[in-house]
Amino acid sequence: MKAVILYTMKGCPFCTMIKEELEKSNIDFLERDIDEYEEEYDEFAKITENEFIPAFLLVTIDEDNNSKDVKLYAPERDFQDIYEGVELVKEYLK
């Protein structure tokens, strides 16, 4: 199973736009507000060396519920606009 986690922040227009695009594409995702999941996001930002949002954590989970493959996608590092970000997610979910 593959899971999509989207890091967002209240009041972020790009976060709202990317959520709308994911929903239009019928992509299920788990939203994590960085104010509520600060430690988790700080670790993500440290690994990606990027603190911009919206950002993605894409996880493949095996039959024992263990993370088998983790991909991190951060804006400006891995994608330049929300549409490119959504395309990365679509490609991952194929």
Please identify what each model-predicted range represents.
Residues 1-30:
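Local sequence-structure signature of Cys/Sec-based thiol-disulfide redox active-site neighborhoods
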Residues 11, 34-37, 78:
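Short beta->alpha junction loops/turns
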Residues 15, 38, 83:
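Loop/helix-junction capping segments adjacent to catalytic residues or to phosphate/diphosphate-binding pockets
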Residues 33-52, 60-62, 86-93:
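Thioredoxin-like thiol-disulfide oxidoreductase module
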Residues 58-94:
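Non-catalytic, surface beta->alpha helical segment in thiol-disulfide oxidoreductase systems
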